[in-house]
Each structure stands twice: as structure tokens, then as C-alpha cells.
Amino acid sequence: FEAEFSVILVRGQDGEIRFWDSTRNSHDHGILATSSLPAGEAIAAQVDRARELARQVADALRYVGVLTLEFFATRDGPVFNEMAPRVHNSGHWTIEGAATSQFENHIRAVAGLPLGDTATVAGSVTMTNIIGADILQTEQWLGQPDTHLHDYGKAEVRDGRKMGHV
């Protein structure tokens, strides 16, 4: 495969579906390291088909809330990888990077409220997971412009453990 990407949607109680832009996901030792926009041409060429597949799943399940499906971009089109019936780590960029975050839209959907705008609010966005002892370098993260630190407040630092994201 050429790349992995996420399709994140929110479906309301009335069946309305909205999608956030799809991110290119990079992994390190099997753990999501980054989710980035723009995702690149290989992914952009496959997003419409992947969204249609995601829409079919959400509608068939009569799902309400945020649903994430991950795909591999291949020469033959998108290949399904996994599904998360919830807000997802690859969508944490929406907190500051979208008009309405995946968290807010999830609550809106399950509460029967109108869904919010999912538009990306910047030309490029990257969410980077902070893994293990990297959380001890918060000054490095906070010193960068347009960076927002999310420390999960976990008491124990362990190798391979997601401690936060920026």
C-alpha cells in the first residue's frame, strides 16, 4: 500500500452525515505517530470512494455519533483496515483544526442537536502523538507557534504509551 488514511464522519439521529478531511497517518512501531493534512494526491484520489464505503457502513448500522474507518491507499483503490465506533486519535487534530471538533459533534449527534461544520480551518494541520518520555519535553512543544499541547495527565510514563498530543 502507498499510505494509510482515516475517514472520520459524524452521523446524526436524522441520518445526516458530515465528513472531516481525511488525514495521512504515519506509524512508529505500530503506534500512530502523526495524522497530517493535506494528505497528498494518492489519498485524495481515493477519499470519495472511501467516504462512500464509510457512509454505507454508518447507514447500515443506523449509527449515531462519530465513526472512524481507516483505509490503505493502494493502486487498486482504498482497502479497509479497521473501524473505531467512537472519536479517534487520528481525529484529535479537529480540536483546534476544524470548525467543530469530533468531540463536540459526537455530543451533538447523540443529543439530537444539529451537527456542526466539519471544515478544516487551516491550510495544513498535523497532530503528533506524544509517546512515553517525550511528554517530559513539554517546553519543546510549547515553544512552537500555533501548537496546542494536550497532556493526558497519566501518572506513569511508559515506553509506547500515548501521554498526550500536539
Language model regions located:
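Internal nucleotide-binding/catalytic subdomain
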Residues: F1-L69, A73-R75
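A short beta-strand motif that forms the metal-chelation/ATP-contact edge
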Residues: G77-V87
